[in-house]
């Protein structure tokens, strides 16, 4: 959910738009949680939320109704706190509808460029906040990217791969903090890990100094990137 707050802050601070619309998945906790935080922060930052359009897991193919309302609203930017599969359809349908608004998303959009047969030109200038950018120049990222590309298909490298890599070491750090041993029951291990997660700080590929709340929400700084010529480029 904190991605919603960060996205509203970034859009407002960079002057990307004043009239903003949102398309979100009301049946998904990730999407609706980000939307709720975005809505609150957008109001605090003076952004005009001119349209909020929802869909559900059962209605994620045809977005013509949502896009028609958004086009009529005069939105300058459309915020997409959703996953890349639905985003690819929205981008295609938005083009067909003659929508020229900017698009901005969160880490769920990472993977958009890897969709089979997706026209990458539809994603040109799409902006998003993500915890991982493969072309970052810090040593941690460079080492991870080199190791990943040596073993796997480089075209599959995205923030989900980086998240999975970090997750292994995060659980390891929590297990060590909790003193987990092999003779403990599964329920005891789970309870021990939940307690330890709020006490550890982890440096990883997707963030430095990562910490966790009791709710499981992670605290880490996302990176802003824009898709240009089929590649992620860092933004200020």
Feature names for model-found ranges:
Residues 1-236:
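Extracytosolic ligand-binding ectodomains
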